[in-house]
Amino acid sequence: MYKKEKNRFLKSKQINYINWRFFLLYGFIFLSLFILTLRVIFLQIISSNRLITEGDRRTLRTQSLLSTRGAIKDRRGYPLAVTVLVNAICADPSVILKTKNIKNHKRWQALSEILSIPLKKMFLRINSHKKSKFIYLARQINPEISEYIKKLQLPGIFLLEESKRYYPFKEISAQLVGFTNIDGIGIEGIEKSFDLLLTGKPGKRKIRQDNKGHVIEKISLVHKRASNNLNLSIDTKLQTIVYNELQEGVKKSQSDSGTAILINIKSGEVLAMANSPSYNPNNIRHIIQKNVRNKAITDLFEPGSTVKPIVIIEALKLGIIQENSIIDTKPFLIQKHQIKDVSYHEKLTITGILQKSSNVGVSKIALSMPTLKLLDSYIKFGLGKPTQLGLIGEKHGFFPPKKRWSNLDKATLSFGYGLMVTPLQLARLYSTIASYGIYRPLSIIKTDRPTGGKQIFPPKYVKKVINMMESVSQPGGGGLQAAVRGYRVAVKTGTAKKVGIHGRYIKKYTAYTAGIAPASDPRFSLIIILDNPQGKKYYGGAVSAPVFSNIMKLILKKMNIKPDNLSNQKMILKSNKRN
């Protein structure tokens, strides 16, 4: 009986123990499931955004799809500015600083040498950005060097594709074309003025990668917007001629600088625009800042004798003078100021006034016409008004806003003092004269159709003055050295004193020659400006006229323009022997 009771008790105790263990295990499982459920709820609901963000940070990548900057080309399609693919050498400091014995590693030494960055300086830069995952070590590295660096397989060093501008014509078109900064943004010249047109919009795509860098999902794509190429009106063959001859002229005359502009009369297109001294836009680290400026649109000067044809055209139109009129050109006084010429002439014809560049003669003609008519003629030719060529930095010039004009004001205005123009405005003036009085907008962009214009003066009067201007490059004229063998050229030379920083005239000069060729059927207008010639001669007829002749001779030959005056060849040969 006792054994039965004992067995029953032990059996009951065993069952209770098993039940207790069962319930304990059950409770543990239930508690675990409860905790897991809470954790799932926490992860899926409460902390889901953080987890998604963390996962995306590890797997999502946004890749830029570069849009190559548009090319700048000349009218024939020759490249003036192109984009070449290069690489940026980048570093991830967070990875590099985990690497041991970096400074003693030969591959790091090789990187230092190929980038010309001292190893100590490189690691000072890396250490100063310890928490960064991206810094630049070098930019715009050519593909050969980039490939070498890639083969070094340095931890934390990687390549980033980027672009660089290259300018094939270097100094020849530097001030006009300009350049971009290291990020491809135009900061000078055409590059700056047409930056929006040349710049496309980069695209981007969002992808998901696995831990080995393989693309496992393409999430989104924003297509890049293509950039535009730009075809300028410039002809690089003519631009090269103009630049080389201008450079030589600046050197011979010992001028501070020189500017030359060539215009296609029929279309108003700028075929060449050159400055000297220049710079190499492919190496902007070593440029002289004053040489960057495009003086054709930024610099102002008093046009001097180059405006005298305007006065003659207006006087002929008003009937104040006739083609065969004779003018008394003896010196005279206005308000205690003497008006005189460089060389004395008692009387001159209208042609003689232009040929000898008589200040006295043109002053007397200007004084005989209504003031408003004189001013209006200058305004019609665009003096003191921007050309609206589209180039950033173009100056307006200066036309005096006087309500009352004294006789002295009128006299000095007639020979180009008291107003300021840019070289481009002067080029437009002579382009208008060459078009027989048609005021046509200039263009730096290639045009496929003839540009319309406005007839601002009757052609018959303008043609008469062009014929008179031919005498300037003939024996007895101040611009004899501007003559071109075999061609009739209509020119006007000039010399003006420069204004100093205190607003007074100083003993420095601007010499210029502006002209048209061939005079029988004008095709081109050309202006040459030399700033502060410091040689023995400084007059326009002596320093800028030869540059005009050299350039125009080569231009007419290059463009296969038929000679229209074979009779002047002997005259030029004799003149050259005398000089």
UniProtKB/Swiss-Prot annotation:
Family according to the record: Belongs to the transpeptidase family. FtsI subfamily.
Enzyme Commission designation: 3.4.16.4
NCBIfam families per record: PRK15105.1
Lineage: Bacteria, Pseudomonadati, Pseudomonadota, Gammaproteobacteria, Enterobacterales
Species per Swiss-Prot/TrEMBL record: Buchnera aphidicola subsp. Acyrthosiphon pisum (strain APS)
Cellular component terms per the entry's GO annotation: plasma membrane
Membrane topology: Single-pass membrane protein
Primary site of residence: membrane
Entry annotation: catalytic residues: 305 (acyl-ester intermediate)
Name recorded for this polypeptide: Peptidoglycan D,D-transpeptidase FtsI
Signal sequence extent: none
Biological role stated in the UniProt entry: Catalyzes cross-linking of the peptidoglycan cell wall at the division septum.
Residues passing through the membrane, by range: 22-42
GO molecular function per UniProt: penicillin binding; peptidoglycan glycosyltransferase activity; serine-type D-Ala-D-Ala carboxypeptidase activity
